[in-house]
UniProtKB/Swiss-Prot annotation:
Pfam families in the record: 7tm_1
Organism whose genome encodes this protein: Limnocottus bergianus
UniProt topological domain (Extracellular) ranges: 1-7, 68-81, 145-173, 246-257
Biological process according to GO: absorption of visible light; G protein-coupled opsin signaling pathway; visual perception
Protein name: Rhodopsin
């Protein structure tokens, strides 16, 4: 054991809790939306995509991590490590790029940079395809030799190798690519869209261009999406910051707990999206009841 066995027991219990909550709430989101036709709107397609991404993380990654935490090391071997790292990365990236699509949708609908534009089912499907292509562009390269998935922290979960400069894997170039293309760029797009959105909402309120009844539904949807983005940042920024620090300070003395806690905290992302959606979407709650 790299740390006290009680630490592994705590991680195992934490992962069990995430599975216990994450599986039913995400399945509930999928079931209720697919069961009720009035919930099958273009915007909800993207929210369904978030639920699918969360299920990838819960079923493909968390179950493996819980099992290895109970044993105190990567007991499933190289293949198990690769699968866990792949599903965790894929699910996290689908969620991030889905938030990008949601941000762009909110910007176009509220700010109207393109006159007479309606976000239709075709646009939603294009957004879904885009989020999957970008997520696969991040999760697949370590499977084929550009970087690799290795045990990290307390050795009971796996992720991209930003710890070493192992020969033949080009870890440095992949980590830089991942941070720029799959972290900084999507965050920049999200911040741009919500920056413009905030300005537009203030201008509309000041000029009273629209009635309160017209503005209210858009405000509620926008508020829900903004809270999802904030929750994502709270969960994932610590993990990304620690990963970048380790990458830039390879060889420095840092313990397994320092590497593990932000990573496991980020995994809670799999339960907050559906809970925000359920709590803040009145129409969904009515259909659920």
């Amino acid at each position: 054991y790299l740390v006290n066995p009680a630490g592994y027991a705590a991680l195992g219990a934490y992962m069990f809790l995430l599975i216990l909550i994450g599986s039913p709430v995400n399945f509930l989101t999928l079931y209720v939306t697919l069961e009720h036709k009035k919930l099958r709107t273009p915007l909800n397609y993207i929210l369904l995509n978030l639920a699918v991404a969360d299920l990838f993380m819960v079923l493909g990654g968390f179950t493996t991590t819980m099992y290895t935490s109970m044993h105190g090391y990567s007991v499933l071997g190289r293949l198990g490590c690769i699968l866990e790292g792949f599903f965790a990365t894929l699910g996290g990236e689908i969620a991030l790029w889905s938030l990008v699509v949601l941000a762009i949708e909110r910007w176009i609908v509220v700010c109207k940079p393109i006159s007479n534009f309606r976000f239709t089912e075709d646009h939603a499907i294009m957004g879904l395809a885009f989020s999957w292509v970008m997520a696969l562009a991040c999760a697949v390269p370590p499977l084929v030799g550009w970087s690799r998935y290795i045990p990290e922290g307390m050795q009971c979960s796996c992720g991209v190798d930003y710890y070493t400069r192992a020969e033949g894997f080009n870890n440095e170039s992949f980590v830089i690519y991942m941070f720029i293309v799959h972290f900084l760029i999507p965050l920049s797009v999200i911040f741009f869209c919500y920056g413009r959105l905030l300005c537009a909402v203030k201008e509309a309120a000041a000029a009273q261009q629209e009635s309160e009844t017209t503005q209210r539904p858009e405000k509620e949807v926008t508020r829900m999406v903004v809270i999802m983005v904030i929750a994502f940042l709270v969960c994932c920024l610590p993990n990304a910051s620690v990963a970048w620090w380790i990458f830039c300070n390879q060889g420095s003395d840092f313990g397994p707990i320092f590497m593990t806690l932000p990573s496991f905290f980020a995994k809670s992302a799999a339960i907050y999206n559906p809970m925000i959606y359920i709590c803040m979407n009145k129409q969904f709650r009515h259909c659920m009841i």
